[in-house]
Amino acid sequence: MSRTGVLVLGPAGVGKSTFCNSMIAYMQSIGRRAHIVNLDPAANPTEYEFTIDVKDLISLQDVMEEMELGPNGGLVYCFEFLLNNLDWLDEEIGDYNDEYLIFDCPGQIELYTHIPVLPTIVRHLQTSLNFNLCATYLLEAPFIIDNSKFFSGALSAMSAMILLELPHINILSKIDLVKDEYSKKQLKKFLNPDPLLLAKQEDYINPKFAKLTQSIANLVDDFGMVQFLPLDCSKDSRSVETILSYIDDVTQWSEAQEPKEPHDEVELPDEVF
C-alpha cells in the first residue's frame, strides 16, 4: 500500500510551521490521522509535537559548535549527514501506512536549488518507501506590496516545482495581513501572477531594475505553472480545508484507502423505540 506525504517548503518566516499545525488541527477535527516530520535541524518546538524529528539524529546547534560552521554551512552538513543515514529515516517512518506525514522543511532554498539534497530525499521516499508525495510552497502575502519582490518569490516557487518534479501547490500565506488593504478583486490578480501587475511600477523605479523584474515576470508567465491558493490560519479552517482537498486530489489519497467493512449489526439507541 502506498503512503501519502506532503512537503511544506518556502523561505524562513512564511508560516510553514503554522500551516503544518493548522493542517494537523483540521485533520484531527475530521477524524483523519496525520503526523509532522521535522526535517529542519534548527527548528523550535511547535504547538503539535513532532512525531519524527531530525534533531534526534543531528542538530544544527551541535554542528555549528563542534565543526565551527556558520548557519548555512552547518545546515548543509546536517543534510549531508542525513543523506548518509537515510536508514534512520526509514526506521523512524516505520509502519506509518494509512496516515498523512507532513514534512516540515527548512527555509533555505539552496537545499533544492544549489545542491540536490531535498530532491535526493524525495526520490528516496518515492522509491524506497513507496510514498505518493505532494510539494507545497508558501509565499507570504505581504510580498504583494512590492510587485518585484512578489515575482521574485514566484520564480523561487517555480524553481522548486521544476527541481523537485512533484505535484505542486503554491500557497499565498498570511492573507489576513493584507485583506484589509486589498480587495478580493485585487488579490485574485496575484493568485494567478500577471506581468501587467508591473505596469504601474515602471515609472518610478530604476530602468535596469524594471527591465530585470519584467523579464522575471515574463519568464514566470511563459511557463504558466505558478498559481497560488490563499491561506488564512487566523480565524477559520476553510482555506486549510480547500488546500487539503487539492492535496488529496493530486496524491490520490482517497483511492489509496482500504475499503471499510460495514458493521454486521447496527445498535439503535433506546429512545428510538
From Swiss-Prot:
Chain positions of site Stabilizes the phosphate intermediate: 72
Hydrolase found in the keyword field: yes
GO-annotated biological processes: mitotic sister chromatid cohesion; protein import into nucleus
Keywords from the UniProt entry: GTP-binding, Hydrolase, Nucleotide-binding
Pfam families recorded: ATP_bind_1
Molecular function terms from GO: GTP binding; GTPase activity
Residues where GTP binds: 13-18, 173-176
CDD domains: GPN3
Motif residue range(s): Gly-Pro-Asn (GPN)-loop: 70-72
Record's function text: Small GTPase required for proper nuclear import of RNA polymerase II and III (RNAPII and RNAPIII). May act at an RNAP assembly step prior to nuclear import.
Oligomeric form and interacting partners: Heterodimers with GPN1 or GPN2. Binds to RNA polymerase II (RNAPII).
Family that this chain belongs to: Belongs to the GPN-loop GTPase family.
Protein name: GPN-loop GTPase 3
Organism: Candida albicans (strain SC5314 / ATCC MYA-2876)
Lineage, opening ranks: Eukaryota, Fungi, Dikarya, Ascomycota, Saccharomycotina
